[in-house]
A protein has these predicted regions:
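N-terminal intrinsically disordered, cationic/polar leader segments
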Residues: 1-108
Length: 108
């Protein structure tokens, strides 16, 4: 099976980022995905890299990730997603969960 690699960049209203240098959550498995956040000085921007077997949903990925950036105000971060046929709502939920967990790690 061929995998599609997508790359996006988003402007962020904020430069809120995670404190750990990186954070990983999830497992690539049937209908799910894994996400990694990497802290990086990007002038407030967000870079997103997606590896997926699903062809033809580039615009959906872009809109979902743009919504995540706009909703959370996160910036100065690289988001890497390894997808295994997760639906858009599952992807959105997983990246929100990962950010919540990464933020919780900061409080410890």
């Amino acid at each position: 099976m061929a995998l599609l690699n997508l790359e996006f960049q988003f402007e962020s209203e904020n430069t809120q980022t995670i404190t750990p240098e990186w954070f990983h959550m999830g497992v690539t498995g049937s209908g799910d995905m894994e996400v990694m956040f990497i802290k990086k000085d990007l002038g407030g921007k967000v870079e997103a890299k997606v590896c997926t077997p699903v062809i033809g949903f580039d615009a959906v990925w872009q809109k979902m990730l743009e919504k995540f950036v706009n909703d959370t105000g996160v910036g100065n971060i690289v988001i890497e997603i390894n997808d295994d046929n997760a639906t858009p709502i599952v992807v959105y939920m997983r990246v929100r969960q990962a950010l919540a967990e990464a933020t919780a790690k900061e409080a410890e």
